[in-house]
């Protein structure tokens, strides 16, 4: 399973570990992904999403129905 947020599309990014001696080695910054189930009143069912905490805040702000409508408009199968 890819480490990609279903709502925001955030993916792992690449950067450097930097030691005290300023040696640099490659590392990955992973998104803070959470598996969450949401009750969708309009569909009378639970919907499972793999989302970041930033997406969770977006759902709190806009509502799950609006977020699901955007996902379906972009072609995501929910």
UniProtKB/Swiss-Prot annotation:
Keyword Nucleus among record annotations: no
Provide the coiled-coil residue spans: none
Secretion signal: which residues?
none
The terms under GO molecular function for this entry are: structural constituent of ribosome
GO CC aspect terms: cytosolic large ribosomal subunit
Looking at the record's lineage, which domain of life comes first?
Bacteria
One Gene Ontology biological process = translation
Q: Keyword tRNA-binding: yes or no?
A: no
UniProt keyword annotations, A-Z: Ribonucleoprotein, Ribosomal protein
> Would you identify the family this protein belongs to, as annotated?
Belongs to the bacterial ribosomal protein bL28 family.
The record's annotation in PANTHER family points to: 39S RIBOSOMAL PROTEIN L28, MITOCHONDRIAL (PTHR13528), LARGE RIBOSOMAL SUBUNIT PROTEIN BL28M (PTHR13528:SF2)
NCBIfam families from the UniProt entry: L28 (TIGR00009)
Tell me what this protein is called: Large ribosomal subunit protein bL28
Q: Identify the species of origin.
A: Methylobacillus flagellatus (strain ATCC 51484 / DSM 6875 / VKM B-1610 / KT)
Q: Give the lineage.
A: Bacteria, Pseudomonadati, Pseudomonadota, Betaproteobacteria, Nitrosomonadales
